[in-house]
Amino acid sequence: MTKPQGTGGKKKNQLTLAQLAAYDDILTDALVDHAYYWTTIPKNRTSYHPSRGIKEEEITKIIQNHLIVDPDIATAEEKLLATDGLKRFCNTLKTPREQNDFKAHLRRYMSIYLPDCPFEVNATNRYTIVTYEASITARRFIQRNETIKYLAGIQVVITPEEELEMSLRKKDFSLIVSSRSKSTSLFMGPARFANHDCNANARLITRGQAGIEIIACRNIEVGEEITVTYSESYFGENNCDCLCATCESNLRNGWRPVDGEAAVQKSIEDEQPTESSTPYSFRRKRRYGSTALQASRTPSVTPDMRPRVLRKSQSQMMLGERTSTTDSAAQGAGADGQSRKRALEMGTPPFTPTKKQKTTQYPVVPIALSTAPSRGSSDNETSKSPLSFSTTNDNVTDATSQGSESPGPIILSPEPTPIKQAIGLLKQEEGVNEVAVQQVPEAFTPPPSQPTEEEPPMVRPAFERLAARDRMSIANLISGPSSPAPPVVFSVAEVTTHRPKPQTLQLQKTDQTATISTLQTVTAAVQKEAPVVKTESPIKPTVGQVEKITQVQTTTKSCTPSKPKAQAAALPQHHMPVSTAPRGRVPHDYTLTPLLLSEPETAWIMCTHCASAFVQKNAYLTKSTCPRCERHSKLYGYMWPKTEKYGPNDKEERILDHRMINRFLTAEEEARARGRVYWRERMGSKGKQGSSAPSTKGTPAGEKNEQSAKQEQSQGQYVQERFAVRKKVKVQVRSTVPTPVIMTKKDEVAEAAALGLRRSGRARRVSAKLADCELDF
């Protein structure tokens, strides 16, 4: 009886999936995301929100003082649990068992910052390109069969229902399948950051009831990613969708080339550059003839520190993936016309339209035929028809009409008249004089005698547009109720007003404006089961006062606008079907890609320390190290992968205040990274050009030194003479200035009275009587 109770109590005290997910989410948020981590760890619960009580400065200070400089896990645990965020969460745990489980999981994450930890948490975008996921990188050499210290975790068995729910929420990134029991488990802790690889360098080992450890299968070098094998069919059957590094190097599974694509060869960029190589500059022209920036002209040999990645415009990126909205319903025979239309649209830019067609913006929707059509139907209703479009005021509104050839004119009657039987509709293929036939009324009645316009427009059939449509026959359109239906209007021709005046055209003027509707009325007597008649011979419509059409062929090149030779060469004569297959992954498409340069002033940078590429936002000033090296330097005070002093003879100073370190390039390095010449070098080259170089050319080094010394001595004498001359002039000026005479107030008053001045300095006014007396005397 005691044994079942013990096992029952043991199962009862096991961690559940909800508890373990809650512990792991808040600990990864506090000890990884808020420890100078440049991205975020994916959380197990979608409802998780970062705690406001977790502050980065407070967390990193505890890590530095109590885990890195003076390792003490007990003190660090006490300090971390005293922070607002973790203290608040720990208070929500009701039982001591839950609190102990949470503290044990906390110690697993604290251990990854100890100086003797052989790995470090990194990030990679290999799997999704646009988002970063966690990974594990070795920062010291790990021998084969060595248990990777602190890379441990805890697992919990999940049910199939929980597994299905996690897969639907895309949270199945930490699932492992037992090779013996075939049960699925979710493992948490630092071990969850190890990614899958088909040829992994480590393996998962179960320790105890729910513990997990990782042991190296072979020697692991510094900077190498630590990987494990999740399952044989984790990423589809036989891992057919795996995107690991092994599959990437072998071009298999998720990296296999798409049918019709050539296999991508390994680039020599992966090789380490030699010491003699210099950075490559992408500048097309040197501003200055300096030899300081002699670089290779092959960009794949020595990539620049700041490589130039061309950003594709949105239209270029989506050109190969977009599909036609107007031809969404076209199937079968309409595929040829559709591919031809798409080839023209992709090969050459369209005209700038004055009024965009609605058929190029909205999908084609079958329209029910009206029971009472009238001649006064609006143009808006007409333009919504899938077989109609218009041109106005000599402006080409066909977005894909550039480079297309217009067939010859066809004359139709604008008046609805009864017909006897159905015949075919002409269809013109490009460069072919043959006539394809569809079901339309056989004969057309002539229009009433009307005075022609002074310059009537030219009417041409829209055969190219009809070829790109659904090719729905009139019999299918008009098949409906059993009772006879009234006449129906269909679009057969297109009107353009920029062509010369035809000799065989007469139309009735239906509008006061210059717009001519593209719908010319054709009536068809709709019957319940009308026989379908197809003919391959050209049609001769009986049109009065109009010459008959002898042939239907493409118009001359003079009717189409001129096109550059480059565009003409880019358009092949054969069909260009649009590929709808999904684009496969290409090796190394997650580095130096323009997909991550969506924001302005964002650039790919090469790390000066580990030579890895990274994306820097707001790259007005270029950073010198990647986020991984920068985070390590902020935490440990040393450059990656150093964590502590190597011995008593190591004199390198540890700098824990990251604000004292300049993380950007110097002005000279910035200029060279951008392919420019530093201003000191530029000024130095100008000074050398302005000096007396020809006089010293060919002289020995000793004579050059003597000449330069004489020049400096002469320049110094000249400067001294100039200062002496200025001093003499100042002395002479001072000697010529008269010495001031000191006068008392009485003397000033007497002098002013003698000069006839007042105290204020104004002249005294002399009266006229005194002036006359002075004149008499």
From Swiss-Prot:
Reaction catalyzed: L-lysyl(20)-[histone H4] + 3 S-adenosyl-L-methionine = N(6),N(6),N(6)-trimethyl-L-lysyl(20)-[histone H4] + 3 S-adenosyl-L-homocysteine + 3 H(+)
Gene Ontology terms, MF aspect: histone H4K20 methyltransferase activity; histone H4K20 trimethyltransferase activity
Compositional bias segments (type: Polar residues): 291-301, 371-405, 688-698
Purpose: Histone methyltransferase that trimethylates 'Lys-20' of histone H4 to form H4K20me3.
Signal peptide: none
Pfam families the record matches: SET
Main localization of the protein described in the UniProt heading: nucleus
Lineage: Eukaryota, Fungi, Dikarya, Ascomycota, Pezizomycotina
Protein's recorded name: Histone-lysine N-methyltransferase set9
Organism: Neurospora crassa (strain ATCC 24698 / 74-OR23-1A / CBS 708.71 / DSM 1257 / FGSC 987)
Example GO BP: methylation
